[in-house]
Amino acid sequence: MVLLLLVAIPLLVHSSRGPAHYEMLGRCRMVCDPHGPRGPGPDGAPASVPPFPPGAKGEVGRRGKAGLRGPPGPPGPRGPPGEPGRPGPPGPPGPGPGGVAPAAGYVPRIAFYAGLRRPHEGYEVLRFDDVVTNVGNAYEAASGKFTCPMPGVYFFAYHVLMRGGDGTSMWADLMKNGQVRASAIAQDADQNYDYASNSVILHLDVGDEVFIKLDGGKVHGGNTNKYSTFSGFIIYPD
């Protein structure tokens, strides 16, 4: 009986319909379906396999190389004109009709004197804005700075009135290009006002700046009374 079953099973499989094929594995046969578990579609074409679900998002790739440099853009619009520069120093007098320059040579005229209108405090440049004298136009009231127009030896002096009454002190420094060249201090000492004064003689080159900087405390302005003043003039040129 067993022998009959072993012979009948391969014959039944071989006679089944469809394009399926089988393969002998020893004494048994394995049936294979080329269309997968779903079989062919209605028109005989293989049925599509359902897509797999998307996997996890990958890491960000490395940054690519920089592209080529683009061409320069068009020029921008023309900017507004700048402010006019400071006037230059006066030139030496020319020879008059039939005359010559004095034997002593040219004597420059550079001098200024200005007072302080409004009070200041803290750490700032004192802008002496009440200008009385400015021969040569080397002092600028808006910035409080004297700019040397001619190399030579100059004299400067300053007198600053402290606004006290609260037990504090006041320091005022004369600066040349940001470096202290003279200092003065006024202390309260139970008084409402006290003066800090000093003077210097400096050699300056063209473009050097001289100004007074408050280094703590309060300064009385004085409106037009000129309690606090700054002055200077050239002694002789190089």
UniProtKB/Swiss-Prot annotation:
SUPFAM superfamilies xref list: TNF-like
Annotated region described as Disordered, given as residue ranges: 36-101
Compositional bias ranges of the Pro residues kind: 71-96
C1q domain span: 105-238
GO molecular function terms attached to this record: identical protein binding
UniProt subcellular location: Secreted
Protein keywords: Collagen, Secreted, Signal
GO cellular component: collagen trimer; extracellular space
Record GO biological process: ERK1 and ERK2 cascade; fibroblast proliferation; negative regulation of ERK1 and ERK2 cascade; negative regulation of fat cell differentiation; negative regulation of fibroblast proliferation
Signal peptide positions on this chain: 1-15
Domain Collagen-like: 53-96
Gene3D superfamilies per UniProt: 2.60.120.40
Keyword check for Signal: yes
Main location: secreted
Transmembrane segments: none
Tissue spec. comment: Highest expression levels in testis and adipose tissue, lower levels in skeletal muscle and kidney.
Source species, domain of life: Eukaryota
The protein's role, per its UniProt record: May regulate the number of excitatory synapses that are formed on hippocampus neurons. Has no effect on inhibitory synapses. May inhibit adipocyte differentiation at an early stage of the process.
Subunit structure: Forms homooligomers, predominantly dimers or trimers. Forms heterooligomers with C1QL1, C1QL2 and C1QL3, when proteins are coexpressed; this interaction does not occur after secretion. Interacts with ADGRB3.
Protein name according to UniProt: Complement C1q-like protein 4
Organism: Homo sapiens (Human)
Taxonomic lineage of the native organism: Eukaryota, Metazoa, Chordata, Craniata, Vertebrata
